[in-house]
Amino acid sequence: LRSNPTVDCTAAVAQDQSCTVSIKIHAQVSPSDSPRKDEVIIRGVAIQSLQNLAWDVNFYTRNTFSRANMDADSFLDYVAFTAANGKQDSPTAGTGDQYKYQARGLDIRYRDMSATEEITTTSQVHFSIVNRSTTVKSEGADGAIVVILAVEPIE
């Protein structure tokens, strides 16, 4: 599953601020109509970013979540990346080369409770991307970021 860098998280993001993203599960994971089309296991998280920043990817089970109200917060799990985790393809990388981050071997059982409660076929993985660096994530194309999720369907 892959976020869209021209649509998702395009604004500037200051330290400890976040942007939210939802990626559709159904039809990307399994072409069949599985009875559990709203449920996957997240096995890996990768980030492509034009800026070398520290990132957290926080997963939520609903499309509504609140930092102010713990009863309404549907937080499930998170994956943290430091700036040192960011690797470039070229040892002599220059402007415009991407930083790539990766976490494998995860076992995050994810169920879209919004889809379950709303009885919809549009299941999504809901997450936020949090900038943990003192440097502001740039807006627009200069701050492009993509989150890629490796998921396994639960049949």
Spans of model-derived segments:
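C-terminal interaction-tip segments
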Residues: 1-15, 34, 117-155
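Intrinsically disordered, low-complexity segments enriched in Ser/Pro/Gly/Ala and basic residues
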Residues: 2, 17, 21, 29, ...
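Short, surface-exposed beta-strand/loop "edge" segments at domain boundaries and coil↔beta transitions
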Residues: 14, 54-55, 65-69, 110, ...
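Beta-rich globular "head" domains
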Residues: 19-63, 146-152
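Hydrophobic side chains in beta-strands
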Residues: 47, 59, 81, 101, ...
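Surface-exposed turn/loop modules enriched in turn-prone residues
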Residues: 50-85
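Extended, solvent-exposed segments with strong compositional bias
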Residues: 73-117
